[in-house]
Structures are given as C-alpha cells and as structure tokens.
C-alpha cells in the first residue's frame, strides 16, 4: 500500500470531528487560494485605458473572464462529471498553472490582447469547483463540508482584492510586513503577483485534499453512490427532472449575474457611496467575512436534518428568504433606513443565502431525496454554465443600454429584479422537487447497497 493509501486509511478511522475538520479545512484552503488567480484584477479600476469602444475597459475585462469561466463550466459538465479519483489532483494543479500563465500574459500584451488573456485566465478556473466538490460529496456530513467550502469564495473574494489593493499601494496586506513588495505593483502586473503569492499554499492544500478517503459504505447507503455520469446517464437525469431543473437554472442565471456584478464592482460602488479614497483598506474583507460567517451558520444547521425531503424543503426556504432580503434591503436603503455599507452587506447576505446552496448543498440533497445515483457535480455545472452566460448578458446590458446609470443605481435596480424573479422561480422549483421526493420510498435498511435508480 502506498503512503497516501495508508494516510487515507488513518483518516477514515479518526474521530468524525477530526475528519470533518481536516476535510473542510483542506477544501476551504484549496478554493480560497484559487480565487487569488481569479478576482484580484477587479481591485483595480483601469480608468485611464482608452481602447476605442463604447464598453468600458474594465467591463470588457470582466466579461472576457466570465466568458472563459462560462466556457469552462460547459467543459466541466463532461470533465468534472467523468474525472476519476486518480486524475483530480493533477487536473487541479494544471488548471491553476494555466490560469497564472494567462495572468502573466495579461501583464505584457497590449490592451486589446489583455481582454483575450483574461478569457484564457477564466477558461481553466471554472472547473476547479467541481473537482473539489467531488472529494466532499456523498458523505453523511456533506452539508457541513460543503457549507464550509461555499464560504471560501465569499471570504476569499474580499481578501484577495484587498491584497491586490495593497500591492497597488505598495503597502503590506493586512499589516503582514513579510508580504510587502519592494514598491507599488503596476495595475496590470498586480493580478499575477497576487496569484504567485498564493501558489504554494494552493499546492499544499491540494496535497491535503488528495489524502481524503472515499465515502464509506455508510455514506453510500445514506447518500447514494456518486459514480461518474456518462452521456446517457446525464441525459436520463435531465429528462427525469427537466421542469424543476429549468426553474432552478432560470433563477441561478439571475443570481449569478447579480452576485458577479456586486462582486466585480464593489470597489466602485463603495467609492460612489462613501467617496473615492475613503473606503477602508480592509473594507471588502470585513464585509465578506461577516457575510460568510452568517451564511455558514445557517448552512451548517442543515447537517442536523437527516430526513432528505425535510432538508430539501428547508434549503428552498433559506433560498427564498435570501431572495426576499435583496428586495427588502434595497427598499430600506432607498428610504434612508440603512447606509450604503450596510446595504452592500445585506445584499451580500441575501444573494449568498440564495446562491450558495446551488453550488452543492441543493443538488446533493436532490440526489439523495430522489435516490438518483450519480455525482451532483453534473447538475451543479448545468446550472453554472447557464448562470455565467446570464452574467455576461447583464454586463453588456449595463454598458450598452444603461450607460448613464451609476454602478450603485444599477445595483439597486438589479437587486429588485433578482428578488422578484428569484422568489417566483424558487417557489415553482421547490414545489416540483417536493413532489418528486414524496414519490420516492426511502430504503428501510442500511447495508451499503445501491437501491433503485427509479429510471423512467
């Protein structure tokens, strides 16, 4: 037996609390570090770049990366669904190295080619999430593990952008003097420099993740086996759940677009609301960390619900509340009841309460409650691929059809739209999957065998 195999066996036998802490930490660190290769470019404004287009240069960069990320999600439907355990770590490392190479290219090519470079940067990164989820899904504690993983991209987005802002200013990120660069880093080199700072931690985190053992027989009995899905199995899944999946995809398209807009232009929005240069150096980290703690507390509670149908209904209730909060928070801000910083924070809480379950928790419970054997990653990537396509459409709409609107004004309008559409589609999908779950007979015994797939 290899050293990795022996360590995996040891991990299988440790106390559940230790195992869950190890698994959650390794996954969190892996995806947290990935964001250092994706989001730092958004910390800069690129206001002095004239590239001869009605679309702002920063908007073009955002769209280019989203297009690459969306294309990656389409590729991930096949790649992540079919990736065997032995290939995952190598794939993760290769994807990140390709993304960093694209950031170096972004720094050295002319402005128009920089747009292409960010497309190439997004192209590998969209598959990282699915590969990490493959290590965590199908376990009795999947809700807890996936809740921690989901908080990684909430926290990391603010942290890596604050690191990028510190590099631009030539100061030490978070006061850690050993991280300071000799001088301010140029705007176009800052993304690559930030990624380089997180490369070694990423490699270490992937190594820890690779040591996780496969789900136990008890995990399989409770959550169904999660084998790779080939083309025929993927088509069978879509045929069986098409009405519900269609409603969820429509909701997710708008939530993804809203989340992306808030995330990519938070620096711009806060400067509009508080005055340029008055935003605290660690403001983004503080906002997103508070949001992440609240979301984690809510999502982790799902671990205590063993009945899959009840858990699924609870997840839809949480998402419904998140969509409602988008509209309520915007109404409070417009009426002067809360300030801009609190509004941005509540928008983050609302969108992530509705958005985070899509990234694993929701589909993991759908698979379990309907007794469909297969990896939830396929369903996640179907939603993701459509979601990022919607994000591109909304970015273009803002610059081409609402150029006079400020970033904060457009965010407020967008929040109202996302709230109304989200409430409608989530209600429809929730009722659909509740009926599907009610029609499934949960096995009365736990023996590790795979029960009926209920094929149509």
Language model features with spans:
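Intracellular loop-helix junctions on the cytosolic face of multi-pass helical membrane proteins
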Residues: 1-18, 168-248, 269-272, 302-307, ...
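Extracytoplasmic gate region of multi-pass secondary transporters
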Residues: 39, 242-275
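Intracellular juxtamembrane helix-capping segments at the cytosolic ends
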Residues: 41, 126-141, 266, 353-370
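Central cavity-lining transmembrane alpha-helices of secondary-active solute carriers
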Residues: 59-80, 290-298
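C-terminal ends and interior cores of transmembrane alpha-helices
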Residues: 94-110, 319-335
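Hydrophobic core of transmembrane alpha-helices in multi-pass small-molecule transporters
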Residues: 112-128, 337-355
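Glycine-rich segments within core transmembrane alpha-helices of 12-TM secondary carriers
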Residues: 142-169, 175, 197-201, 380-394
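Transmembrane alpha-helices of Major Facilitator/SLC transporters
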Residues: 280-307, 322
């Amino acid at each position: 037996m290899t050293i990795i195999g022996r360590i995996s066996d040891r991990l299988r036998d440790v106390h559940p609390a230790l195992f869950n802490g190890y698994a959650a930490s390794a996954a969190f660190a892996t995806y947290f570090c990935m964001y250092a290769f994706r989001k730092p470019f958004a910390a800069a404004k690129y206001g002095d770049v004239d590239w001869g287009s009605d679309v702002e240069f920063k908007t073009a960069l955002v769209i280019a990366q989203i297009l690459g990320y969306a294309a990656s999600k389409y590729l991930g439907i096949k790649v992540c669904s079919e990736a065997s355990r032995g290939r995952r770590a190598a794939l993760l490392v290769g994807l990140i190295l390709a993304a960093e190479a694209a950031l170096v290219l972004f720094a050295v090519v002319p402005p128009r080619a920089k747009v292409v470079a960010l497309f190439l940067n997004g192209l590998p990164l969209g598959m990282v999430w699915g590969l990490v989820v493959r290590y965590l899904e199908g376990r009795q504690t999947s809700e807890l593990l996936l809740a921690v993983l989901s908080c990684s991209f909430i926290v990391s987005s603010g942290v890596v952008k604050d690191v990028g802002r510190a590099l631009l200013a030539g100061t030490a990120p978070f006061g850690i003097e050993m991280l300071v660069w000799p001088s301010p880093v140029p705007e176009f080199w800052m993304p690559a420099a930030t990624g380089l700072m997180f490369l070694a931690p990423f490699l270490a985190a992937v190594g820890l993740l690779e040591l996780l053992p496969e789900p136990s027989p008890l995990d399989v009995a409770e959550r169904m086996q999660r084998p790779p899905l080939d083309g025929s199995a993927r088509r069978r899944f879509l045929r069986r759940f098409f009405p519900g999946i269609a409603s969820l995809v429509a909701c997710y398209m708008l939530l993804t677009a809203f989340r992306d807009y808030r995330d990519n232009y938070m620096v711009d929005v806060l400067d509009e609301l508080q005055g340029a240069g008055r935003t605290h150096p660690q403001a983004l980290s503080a906002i997103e960390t508070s949001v992440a703690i609240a979301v984690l507390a809510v999502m982790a509670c799902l671990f205590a619900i063993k009945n899959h149908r009840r858990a699924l209904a609870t997840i839809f209730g949480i998402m419904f509340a998140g969509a409602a909060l988008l509209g309520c928070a915007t109404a409070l801000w417009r009426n002067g009841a809360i300030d801009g910083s609190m509004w941005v924070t509540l928008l983050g809480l609302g969108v992530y309460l509705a958005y985070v379950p899509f990234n694993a928790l929701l589909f993991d419970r759908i698979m379990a409650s309907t007794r469909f054997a297969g990896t939830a990653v396929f369903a996640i990537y179907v939603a993701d691929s459509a979601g990022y396509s919607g994000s591109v459409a909304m970015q273009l709409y803002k610059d081409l059809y609402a150029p006079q609107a400020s970033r904060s004004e457009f965010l407020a309008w967008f929040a109202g739209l996302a709230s109304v559409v989200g409430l409608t589609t989530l209600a429809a999908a929730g009722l659909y999957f509740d009926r599907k779950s009610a029609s499934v007979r949960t096995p009365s015994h736990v023996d590790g065998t795979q029960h009926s797939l209920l094929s149509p």
